[in-house]
A protein has these predicted regions:
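Non-catalytic pre-domain segments flanking phosphatase-related domains
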Residues: 1-19, 175-187
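Asp-based phosphoryl-transfer active-site loop
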Residues: 10-30, 121, 162
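Short coil/turn segments at beta-strand junctions that form active-site/ligand-binding loops
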Residues: 13-15, 58, 106-107
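Fold-independent oxyanion-binding glycine-rich loops
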Residues: 20-22, 28, 66, 113, ...
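A positional/architectural concept
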Residues: 24-55, 64-65
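Mg2+-dependent phosphoryl-transfer enzymes with acidic/Ser/Thr/Gly-rich catalytic loops
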Residues: 36-40, 77-78, 82-84, 91-187
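Substrate-recognition element of Asp-dependent hydrolases with the DxDx(T/V) motif
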Residues: 50-74, 85, 121
């Protein structure tokens, strides 16, 4: 996806990002252990992308329709302070995130992959999705990309989609991953 001047400006001024979990931070597959525990796999490539975004000072949120303990565990590991899980109304959760951190909705990107994410995407200043998001979501985000407020990753959910977004934010801010990695992450 070509980075337009308006997208570059949007990525440069972005203050926060809210992620759906399943299909964005994971590959969307559901696996159970022999004891019946739900298992999720996260990519270290995406984990590094989140770490770089944190070091740039972006506020983070996880907003998931699933209410699994893995969401809390991931948030704790990544120092993500806002978690809304088991929610059908992701737009309301996004508004709560904005209010809690003193953000305007147009300062936030919502990164989702399926139709239940569209409601939050519609009120966010920017939306992003993995390459393998639902067709309706890819169309919506692609339409927003025409005005610089949408980002369709070249990678699939759970295997680099978030990292490509992080790399685009770094490029828009004339930052290298190496230099940002050396920065101290905000508490």
């Amino acid at each position: 996806m070509a980075t337009t001047e308006s997208l570059t400006n949007g990525l440069r001024t972005l203050q926060a990002i809210a992620f759906d979990v399943d299909g964005v931070l994971t590959d969307g597959r559901l696996t159970w252990s022999p004891s019946g525990e739900e298992l999720k796999t996260f990519s270290f490539t995406d984990i590094m992308g989140i770490s770089l975004l944190r070091r740039l000072g972006l506020k983070m949120a996880l907003i998931s329709g699933e209410a699994t303990p893995q969401v809390d565990l991931f948030a704790k590991k990544m120092h993500i302070p806002f978690v809304a899980k088991g929610t059908r109304d992701k737009a309301t959760a996004l508004r709560e995130f904005a209010e809690k951190f003193g953000l305007q909705l147009d300062q936030i990107c919502f990164f989702g992959d399926d139709v239940n994410d569209l409601f939050a995407m519609e009120i966010a200043g920017m939306s992003a999705c993995p390459a393998n998001a639902a067709d309706e979501v890819v169309r919506y985000v692609s339409d927003r990309a025409k005005t610089g407020s949408g980002f369709v990753s070249t990678e699939n959910g759970g295997i680099g989609a978030v990292r490509t977004f992080a790399d685009a934010v770094l490029a828009a801010r004339d930052q290298s991953g190496r230099d940002v990695f050396l920065m101290k992450a905000p508490e």
